[in-house]
Amino acid sequence: MGRPLRIAIVTGEASGDLLAASLVSGLKKRFPRMQIYGIGGPRMKMLGLDSMADAQELSIIGVVEVLNRFPRIRTIFNALLKRLQSEPPDLLITVDLPDFSLRMARKAKQLGIPTVHYVSPQVWAWRSGRAKTIASYLDLLLCLFPFEPRYYANTGLEAHFVGHPLVQEAVPSYSRSEARKILGVSEAGQLVAIMPGSRRSEIQRLLETFLRTAERLWKRRTNLSFVLIQAETISDQQLYEVWPEALRDLPVIVRHGNAYNWLAASDALLVASGTATLEAALIGIPMVVAYKVNPLTYQIGKQLIKSKFISLPNLIAQSAIVEERIQQDANPEQLSEDLIQLLNRPQEAMAMREALRVVKQSLLPPTHGAVEVVSDFILHKVGYRPGG
């Protein structure tokens, strides 16, 4: 009997842990004696990961936060590198977390260890020239969006679109009528969902704007209902400390948990730019997208970011499916007008739903998904031969 396959893995976000677990679970069916060590979250640990650090320790956003945690991050990096040297794996799989992951991949490549990265850095949004540098660190790249592999076409890197995992996850637990009954909204009434973001900075910049938009809509259409979908990452205190006192009497229902249930019950959505726009697209909910950041950040971003669009549905379709309102244009007057258009013009809303359905179809995993691509890579490029 030959030796078991040995894989080192790095993941640092909850979403990355989910992706890694799905991939490793599939690989274990093909290589049942597989051994894994590295950095991961609870799902990876359940699959037998010999964990050297918790993924949460690498889930840091912001320059100041990274600087504060840098000694610990460096310790984790050096410990994993030392183990790669003492117990060389058959391959290293890194998932998202590009700053940490790609540095580790570069070191692994220097050690002669084959490298696989899951989730392409956003070279399509800014610094597309990075693609060549990224390619020099990797042997295989797994992409979530169908337009991403072409950015690596002239780099020599094998890049594959493998489908987006949210397609399988974006399934409501309730029917539209069941969700409306829970919310106390009649079948005849119209419901507008509000998703102001999953980060505290987004809540601080967008919540009041979104609530004042709802206020303007309600004054024009008193039969409207509103449901604000509170992200799991936002506490009640964080939400209500920026909720203006003057707007506490608005008929806005606040709900936590499965966003898909409340989206499926809604007729339109006002949403902060981010993953939530993709979740809404997969449900097929007509939406207006808002984006606000620090003015200096925006000016810098304008110089770096080359994409015409900010929302994922538009980026994937490469056309203006949904309305995007940025910075000063993301104001209650404009946003309420955009939403009224969606609510008053069912044919336009239906056309948007159809365009979003096409977006969803484009994200379905191909027959040769992540597990198949990596398995082929292990057998044909790494040269591993199962021993039984």
UniProtKB/Swiss-Prot annotation:
Pfam families: LpxB (PF02684). InterPro entries: Glyco_trans_19. GO terms for cellular component: membrane. The keyword Glycosyltransferase applies. Pathway: Bacterial outer membrane biogenesis; LPS lipid A biosynthesis. One of its GO terms (molecular function) is lipid-A-disaccharide synthase activity. This is Lipid-A-disaccharide synthase. It comes from Magnetococcus marinus (strain ATCC BAA-1437 / JCM 17883 / MC-1).
